[in-house]
Amino acid sequence: MRIIKLTVLALCLGVSVVWADDRPIYKDKNAPIEDRVEDLLRRMTLREKVGQLQQRCTWDINNIGGTYNGESFGTAHEMNISAQQAADLYQKIHEYKANETRLGIPILTSAEGIHGILQNGCTIFPQAIAQGSTWNPDLICQMTEAEAAEARVMGIRQVLSPVLDIARELRWGRVEETFGEDPYLISEMGIGFVRGFQKNGVGCMPKHFVAHGTPTGGLNSAFVAGGERELRNLYMYPFARVIKEADPVAVMSCYSAYDGIPVTGSSYFM
């Protein structure tokens, strides 16, 4: 009888060991992050990797399957719905990603948040150009703390903000999204902005790296001419300060060219 019990116990332990070995490392929350990332990347197909670079929106809680079709995309950005609708929709999308895709990779929910979360019913704050006029980074930090609270209620975990572009081309139609024309001021405002969001669990994505706000003729996304000195002393300065002192979770590249080189496609800039 004792031998039988020991045999059964050994078999149970063997099953447990096999189960533990079969569980993907990337799903083990106790494993080192580097190991989890490496394990997941090794399992992903090229199509799945490209999918992580894409954003897919549905707006229809009853047609999530039709929108995603069993595939894994990187981000979701749902707009023009109420806070409750957003929360419900994001929850359903997360459930779909976990249960109906091959690897169960969660989706990153995002929204614009330059002067309030871009969603129906959210608090609207003054535009960034007015924020910069306060010269008060602590006040900006308090503002983004409030924004983060509203974002989390809706299930939004990242904002596509702040804008660290320098307003040196006043014909550009997005000047109001900047903190102003001075790199130091922009840096101080950007640091306060990012800290307020991220200490409350919402990641920031400063943009547009780099020099996007000085397009030729003021046309959005037109090429920028400036040279190496302006690049480093003006345009890169706010990004260097904010990245070093506030540690944002991501950075958005610009969609223009600097001195004839498309920034996003350049290993030098990236």
Region spans (language model):
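Sec-dependent signal peptide recognition
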Residues: R2-L9
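Hydrophobic h-region of N-terminal signal peptides that target proteins for export
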Residues: A10-W19
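Glycoside hydrolase catalytic-domain context in secreted enzymes
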Residues: W19-M270
